[in-house]
Amino acid sequence: MKLFGTDGVRGKAGEKLSAQTAMRLAMAAGIYFRKYSATNVILVGKDTRKSGYMIETAIVAGLTAVGYNVLQIGPMPTPAIAFLTENMRCDAGIMISASHNPYYDNGIKFFDNCGDKIEENIEAEIEKIYYDDEMIANAQKTMTEIGANKRIDDVIGRYIVQIKNSFPKELTLKNLRVVLDVANGAAYKVAPTVFSELGADVIVINDEPNGSNINQSCGALHPEELANEVKRLRADIGFAFDGDADRLVVVDENGEVVHGDAVLGVLATYLNEKKALKGGAVVATVMSNAALEDYLKSHKIKLLRANVGDKYVLEMMKENGINFGGEQSGHVIFNDYAKTGDGLVTSMQVVAMMLKKGKKASEIFKAIKPYPQILLNLKITEKKPLEKIAGLKELEKNLEKDGIRSLFRYSGTENVIRLLLEGKNQNLVEKRMNEVEKFFIKALNA
């Protein structure tokens, strides 16, 4: 059985992701990282899911069993793990989170000693070790060689300093009222602290995690409550994070949710104006709206498209010497400040841009009006290779003739196919989506 998906290992806690699986996976990872070990220390963090305790304990057991020392830092955002792994000179970092998924799911993500998400070839090596009984048995230490673990609570300060350093020193948030929806997740302490220390008038919602309310009708996937609060409190802006705070959704002062591609496009031109956009280009994904491409083109900025997943965006950024990119879902990567999508870094750049321009959020983001786009997540029973689905090529050709861009892809973590249609005529896009949905229901026993 394949362990790794598009973003680490993920599944229902206690089922696909059991304590046994987590412990053995940690042992396999420990065996792999040992080959390049400099400090013999691995950092482990988590979000606020109840199952995080079980998985964390299992991971610590697995790592110490193969001789690794472990630093446990408790609930922290995924980008904090990436930063702290390098900052504290650890051999690797492990984040226990299923990101935006419901509380009953959990996941394990690995970072190398530079704070980068591990590449697919490394995942394959760890997976190979995982299934090698002899290697696992031989790697287990005894007596004095067994590793130790240490729980530390004060590293949050290092990450807060890093986030504040991404905000221009000459600016202050003193006259800004900000509403934060921390999704009962990993940002519940750090996000309010950063904004308060920079002088903002901060109102926080969904900041009482109980182990099972992470992402529950709140945060980046459900910004409705945030939108209402921003309007009610007459705030200047609202920010919604997801469970592990690697993505961000922006709500303007009118309570309107800003399209993710509008956030990307406007931030790109802001960086370009500051002469801080490297490579004269931005990396987005195949899901990004064509309106983003047209907007960037009008500002003489190129758009490159990567596969869906922030690690693929980052790969393409590195290959092309680009320092800015992201996904319309809210993963935005400022490579000068972070190694992965970081909701807090993004929020800092958004408020800095507002202050520098002296404009309201709604005025800034109205520059990009996305073309009508429909994304449908269809539950399926089988993942048949797309190239083997009869009639699909013909369907795609017909959509192209209608001036409709289409993208069909399976989720890497769920039994779902994502159907995307985009065009300039809303009614036509809706009509064609009905036909596409019926086609896939029949083809994939949905």
Curated annotation (Swiss-Prot):
PANTHER family: PHOSPHOGLUCOMUTASE (ALPHA-D-GLUCOSE-1,6-BISPHOSPHATE-DEPENDENT), PHOSPHOHEXOSE MUTASE. The modification Phosphoserine is found at residue 99. One of its GO terms (molecular function) is magnesium ion binding. It comes from Campylobacter curvus (strain 525.92). The gene is glmM. Its cofactor is Mg(2+). Its EC number is 5.4.2.10. Binds 1 Mg(2+) ion per subunit. Activated by phosphorylation. The active site is at residue 99. The lineage of its organism: Bacteria, Pseudomonadati, Campylobacterota, Epsilonproteobacteria, Campylobacterales. It catalyses: alpha-D-glucosamine 1-phosphate = D-glucosamine 6-phosphate. Mg(2+) binds at residues 99, 242, 244, 246. NCBIfam families: glmM, PRK10887.1. Catalyzes the conversion of glucosamine-6-phosphate to glucosamine-1-phosphate. Belongs to the phosphohexose mutase family. One of its GO terms (cellular component) is cytosol. Keywords: Isomerase, Magnesium, Metal-binding, Phosphoprotein. This is Phosphoglucosamine mutase. GO terms for biological process: carbohydrate metabolic process; peptidoglycan biosynthetic process; UDP-N-acetylglucosamine biosynthetic process.
